[in-house]
Amino acid sequence: MKKDLHPEYHEATVTCASCGNTFKVGSTKENINVEVCSQCHPFYTGRQRFVEHGGRVEKFKKKYNMD
């Protein structure tokens, strides 16, 4: 392998915005934020749950000051 060609690979902390769960994975980034993880996603938990988050329309309105 060539030196100084590949990005550094280290342990990253993944943080869930919905439930606050954190876990460690290997990545080129140090911190990763996700909206839903396996601890709170309805597919994995088997129950319906409504998650409050900004959708694409809200992000667009915020970006162009259309509130």
Swiss-Prot record:
It comes from the Bacteria. The keyword Transmembrane does not apply. InterPro entries: Ribosomal_bL28/bL31-like_sf, Ribosomal_bL31, Ribosomal_bL31_A, Ribosomal_bL31_sf. Pfam families: Ribosomal_L31 (PF01197). Part of the 50S ribosomal subunit. Belongs to the bacterial ribosomal protein bL31 family. Type A subfamily. HAMAP family: Ribosomal_bL31_1 (MF_00501). PANTHER family: 50S RIBOSOMAL PROTEIN L31, CHLOROPLASTIC, LARGE RIBOSOMAL SUBUNIT PROTEIN BL31C. This is Large ribosomal subunit protein bL31. It comes from Finegoldia magna (strain ATCC 29328 / DSM 20472 / WAL 2508). The gene is rpmE.
